[in-house]
Amino acid sequence: MKDAVAAYGRFFETIAPDSLDRLDGIVAPDVRFVDPFNDVTGIEGYRAVFRHMFETVDQPRFTILRTAIDGDTAFYRWRFSFRRKGVADIWTIEGMSEVRFLANGLVAAHIDHWDAASQLYERLPVIGTLLRWIRRKLAV
């Protein structure tokens, strides 16, 4: 299990468009992937999520900050940095992935947990202003 967890973490830290073909040996054919934008089942849907990432952002990079294992599940604390197309600023998102492994070491499910509102939407023009206002109104 530890080897599979480490290998999956390395895959993300070195992810590139040409590495997506390696997913066949890393994730199960019916893998489920969930994040704030996607809920897909199957290896092709999983690949499509990352193809879309490479099409829409420049210099995407995942850094695994911490890993914990509980039974067949690993938890990865990570930082994702990228540049929006045509924008010089580097954006950073931090989150946690809950990843369930099968007995053969393949990934069965990958569920991402991160706050899209505060880490992404609030940084966008117009909608960001509205969301920051709402957050201030709801805060204690």
Enumerate the predicted regions with their spans:
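A beta-strand edge to alpha-helix "cap/lid" segment located at domain peripheries
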Residues: 55-61, 65-140
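Soluble or luminal CAZymes and related metallo-dependent hydrolases
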Residues: 3, 7, 45, 91
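Short, mixed-charge, low-aromatic patches
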Residues: 1-10, 33-36, 52-57, 108
